């Protein structure tokens, strides 16, 4: 499980990105890179890192399910992810 402070920091970054998205888009269209550089660093979408919604793990993230491979495997074995079943051929 990831530290709660890291998960909270990532959530704060996500909120900042959403808050400044319109302003960033307008400044980029104008080409005003001076004003763009004065916005908070964490408002840049490139600073976001995907984290597992269950454990907060930053690595081995599966975008489709928004969780890490470890959490995915556990929940899939329990049958708690709709439409997912173990493959057999």
Curated annotation (Swiss-Prot):
One of its GO terms (biological process) is translation. Gene3D superfamilies: 30s Ribosomal Protein S14, Chain N. The keyword DNA damage does not apply. Transmembrane segments: none annotated. One of its GO terms (molecular function) is rRNA binding. Contacts proteins S3 and S10. Part of the 30S ribosomal subunit. NCBIfam families: PRK08881.1. Belongs to the universal ribosomal protein uS14 family. This is Small ribosomal subunit protein uS14A. It comes from Bacillus subtilis (strain 168).
């Amino acid at each position: 499980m990831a530290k709660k402070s890291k998960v909270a920091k990532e959530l704060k970054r996500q909120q900042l990105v959403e808050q400044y998205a319109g302003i960033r888009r307008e400044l980029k269209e104008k080409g005003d890179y001076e004003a763009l550089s004065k916005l908070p660093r964490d408002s840049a979408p490139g600073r976001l890192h995907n984290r597992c919604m269950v454990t907060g793990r930053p690595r081995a993230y599966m975008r489709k399910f928004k969780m890490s491979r470890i959490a995915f495997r556990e929940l899939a074995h329990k049958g708690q992810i709709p439409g997912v079943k173990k493959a057999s051929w």
